[in-house]
Amino acid sequence: MARIAGVNIPSNKRVCIALTYIYGIGRTKAGEICERTGIAENRRVNDLSDDEVVRIREIIDSEYKVEGDLRREVAMNIKRIMDLGCYRGLRHRKGLPVRGQRTHTNARTRKGPAKPIAGKKK
């Protein structure tokens, strides 16, 4: 099991799939990384040499924002919007959908489980 960007990469999977276990790297970026390091996408992680793992690690560390740094940046962006007091920030604060979805019905994922209202019956 190789360790890249603080994540244990599963050794029995193909390289392009295994790299997606890192937060911030999807299928497209994983394909780019494999192409730039000269590693075939269909090779398994346990078939990689230590040198190839080091090359992957260097590219990810130098050029991509992943894991903790990316999570921190996303959280800071949301916090900045909330501090501005703009409409999107208010929606984040209230725990409602931010991107214009309807809330009269639906939006249960964002709002949480339904809260019963006393005296309300049909």
UniProtKB/Swiss-Prot annotation:
Keywords: Ribonucleoprotein, Ribosomal protein, RNA-binding, rRNA-binding, tRNA-binding. One of its GO terms (cellular component) is small ribosomal subunit. InterPro entries: Rbsml_uS13_C, Ribosomal_uS13, Ribosomal_uS13-like_H2TH, Ribosomal_uS13_bac-type, Ribosomal_uS13_CS. Disulfide bonds: none annotated. PROSITE patterns: RIBOSOMAL_S13_1 (PS00646), RIBOSOMAL_S13_2 (PS50159). Pfam families: Ribosomal_S13 (PF00416). The keyword Transmembrane does not apply. Part of the 30S ribosomal subunit. Forms a loose heterodimer with protein S19. Forms two bridges to the 50S subunit in the 70S ribosome. Located at the top of the head of the 30S subunit, it contacts several helices of the 16S rRNA. In the 70S ribosome it contacts the 23S rRNA (bridge B1a) and protein L5 of the 50S subunit (bridge B1b), connecting the 2 subunits; these bridges are implicated in subunit movement. Contacts the tRNAs in the A and P-sites. NCBIfam families: uS13_bact (TIGR03631). This is Small ribosomal subunit protein uS13. It comes from Rhodospirillum rubrum (strain ATCC 11170 / ATH 1.1.1 / DSM 467 / LMG 4362 / NCIMB 8255 / S1).
